[in-house]
Amino acid sequence: MRRICFRAWVLTQCGGFRLILFVFLTLIVSSSLFAAPQEVLTNEQSPQASTEMQHEVGNPTPLSVLIEEAKKNDPAIHVAESAARAATFAAPQMSTLPDPQFTLQQFSVGSPRPFAGYTNSDFAYIGLGASQQFPYPGKLRLRGAVADRDAGAVKAHVEVVLQDEIETLKTTYFHLAYLQQSLGILQQNAALLQQIEQQAEAHYSTGQGNQRDVLKAQLERTKILREISMHHQLVGEDQAVLKRILRRSQDSSDIIPEPLSATFLRYSASELLDKVRGQNPNVQEDAAMIQRNQMAAELAQKEFRPDFEVSYMYENTDRKFRDYYMLSFSVNFPRRKPRRAALAQAQVNIVRSQQEQDAQVQAVLAEVQKQYVTIKASEEQLLIYRDGLIPQAQATIQAGLTAYESSRTDFESLFSSYMDVLNLDLEYQQTLLDHETALAHIERLSGVTLP
């Protein structure tokens, strides 16, 4: 301060240097006024700087590698696969004869005491018998077939879970790549805004600008800091989802995605729609349920037929009497009222499952068409952004910087050009994310694999 005061005293001795003194003191005041926000910006950028170093050190992981890892490790897929394996054991249980029954019988005569009358009556005996129930021919086969169809539906559900998890993996991976690229855009524009702020300070210090321009630039820099902080939060959320799908420890190293780039769709809308019935996993699951219900209706029809039981018993008497041998054959007479209700229920279930499949198909077809329109529109928009809007905005800001530096344009025009560059860059990345997300959804709906 003594050095500054001394210099000011010397300059005041000469009337011709009064203007220089005013400019010098103005620069001191303005630098002290805006030192705190700049220091905050520097401190706030330090975590991002360390994150950038991690991104530079780590290597991006291709999406295909993560998909293969998810197929092996995803807990949700493991649960569905275990359920499918368990369902395969139902058919042998349903298609096997009922358990045989064995009987040991003792018949007393003249007294409730065991073996009473055994030696003096030919009615007293010790019997050993066995019996077996036989369902009407075809019932066991149909019961096993129904169980097989149940297992087929559970197996089809495995593919539903698999495709759902892969779609979640893809969309989260794309969103993480979007955050990574938009974060770079925010940092680049923060540097550009700092350049604009410095020029605004220079204009303000020379009396050609006003303090409002400087404060407005600093406010925008603070907003960028907020956006960067929100990006860090979203990155952490995406990392948690990816590690859950891959069954990695949540404190393991972060996954670095490859840069997001546009993949143009080579299928026509009609080709995608044609693949829905044959390749959509939800439609296939509904088809398996239709087959199951059809087989259950056949079984309900067969339940009108009676079941049979055969039993045989050997009855041993005393040596002086002859033994007894008894063969029995029995048949049940099914009550028709509950059987008719069961058959009607099975037939309604067939209609219901067919209606569910039709509703599912129509919903998928509509969603495929919707996503197809989104993809084609975003492809056009990406070209407009890449070849038109963004280059024009960049040329405008460069011309504006040059003009503002030489005081040939005002701050508002320059700031508007800067906001155009920032918003168009972010809009391009958002459109690119929407495009890739729609492609992942198309893959899930139609069953196609896109490059």
Describe each region flagged by the PLM.
Residues 43-60, 103-134, 143, 255-266, ...:
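Small/polar, glycine/serine/threonine/aspartate-rich low-complexity segments that form flexible
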Residues 68-78, 85-100, 128-145, 156-163, ...:
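A glycine-/polar-enriched beta->alpha junction
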Residues 35-101, 106, 133-134, 250-291, ...:
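Bacterial Sec-pathway N-terminal export signals of envelope proteins
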Residues 79-94, 161, 165-186, 195, ...:
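Amphipathic alpha-helical coiled-coil segments
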Residues 2-3, 16-18, 46, 161-277, ...:
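Periplasmic alpha-helical coiled-coil/stalk elements that build and connect Gram-negative outer-membrane
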Residues 18-31:
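Bacterial N-terminal signal peptides
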Residues 2-7, 11, 21, 34-55, ...:
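Acidic, low-complexity, intrinsically disordered peripheral segments
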